[in-house]
Every structure is written in C-alpha cells, then in structure tokens.
C-alpha cells in the first residue's frame, strides 16, 4: 500500500494565469512557472519516490523535470478534464451563456462529465494504492482535486470545493488505515 501519494500541480501557464479552462491544449509554462518548478525541487529534496506518474502534457512533464523528478510513466488518466466546447474559456465567459454552470455538477458539452472523470481517478487510485512506498503524481488542477476526492471515497464533485494553486504540493495518506488528505495546497 502506498504510504503517501504526493500531488504536484504543474506550475503556471499563460492560460492558468488568465483563469482559462486548459484541458487538452498543450500550453507551455511561463518563465515564472519555470522558476516555481525549480523551487519545487528544493521542497522535494530528500524525498524518495517509488513511482512518479505524470500527465503526458508538456506543462506537467516540464514541472516534474524542473522539480528534479523523472516520470516513471505517463498516464492519460492524469490528463486534465476534457473541457470540450469550453476549452480556453473562463468561467465568467461560460456563465454568460449558461448561468449557474458548475463544472463539477454539469460537466462540459463535447467534453467530459463528472462520472467520466471519477472513473479515470478511480483507476489511478487503484494503481497507486498497490505501490509499496511513496508515489508522486504530476498533473493538473481539476484532475488532482477530483483524485483527492476519490482517494477519500467522496463523490467527485467534492473536488469543486478544494482550491489548488499552480506549482503546489498536496499529500494523500492514511491515518489508522483510513484514506485521508494529509496536506493540501502547500
């Protein structure tokens, strides 16, 4: 059983800075994002990971590399939410046409619905729980929030109540054999 699962959200991109939904578009890190990625490496110094899994998108892979991590494998299940018709739009832009829209409840036309994302997260959780030692997952804001919810056996929409900044570290673990969120958004 994985002793801890460290979640690393990729560092800043132009779209994340602007609040745009960035799903499958492969946006590079900003210069500031690269600096944050390097500083993540300082925070991870001395940590030993039995497995490091990354989203295949360059912003996640570059963040991992800058942080001194070597991706053991790329997982499509760690890709960001597929925003379909809403790719590149901000939430206010979407709500101008669809008042009250909430990603975690409503999903996205032409993209993923919450049960689709939950299924991806459940596959990742099953994989990492089988690993002996510490695991690192380097991916994206919404998928990591959803993954944290599924780790504690909560509905995927709980992720909509968790804020996760770019270039942050969160830790999933166990307390008395119960899955917990040990640290969040640090």
Where are these regions (language model features)?
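Acidic, low-complexity terminal tails and accessory targeting/binding regions
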Residues: 1-3, 47, 82-92, 149-186
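Generic beta-sheet signal
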Residues: 5, 131-142
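Loop-to-helix element that buttresses phosphate recognition and phosphoryl-transfer chemistry
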Residues: 5-63, 109-122
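Short, well-ordered beta-to-alpha junction loops that form the rim of enzyme active sites
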Residues: 11, 55-57, 77, 121, ...
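Phosphate-coordination/substrate-recognition cap region in phosphate-metabolizing enzymes
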Residues: 39-102
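Glycine-rich phosphate-binding loop signature in dinucleotide/nucleotide-binding domains
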Residues: 45-48, 128-133
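Short glycine/proline- and acidic residue-enriched helix-loop micro-motifs
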Residues: 96-116
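GST superfamily/GST-like fold recognition
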Residues: 141-145, 175
């Amino acid at each position: 059983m994985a002793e801890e699962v460290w979640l690393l959200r990729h560092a800043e991109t132009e779209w994340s800075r602007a609040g745009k939904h960035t799903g499958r578009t492969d946006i590079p890190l900003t210069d500031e994002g690269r600096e944050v990625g390097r500083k993540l490496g300082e925070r991870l110094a001395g940590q030993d990971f039995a497995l490091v899994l990354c989203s295949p998108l360059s912003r996640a892979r570059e963040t991992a590399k800058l942080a001194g991590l070597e991706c053991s494998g790329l997982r499509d299940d760690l890709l960001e939410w597929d925003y379909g018709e809403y790719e590149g739009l901000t939430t206010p832009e979407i709500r101008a046409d669809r008042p009250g829209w909430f990603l975690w409840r409503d999903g996205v036309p032409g993209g993923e619905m919450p049960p689709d994302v939950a299924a991806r997260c459940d596959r990742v959780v099953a994989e990492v729980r089988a690993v002996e030692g510490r695991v690192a997952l380097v991916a994206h804001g919404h998928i990591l929030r959803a993954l944290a919810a599924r780790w504690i056996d909560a509905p995927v929409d709980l992720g909509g109540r968790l804020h996760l900044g770019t270039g942050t570290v969160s830790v999933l673990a166990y307390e008395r054999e119960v899955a917990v969120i040990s640290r969040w958004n640090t």
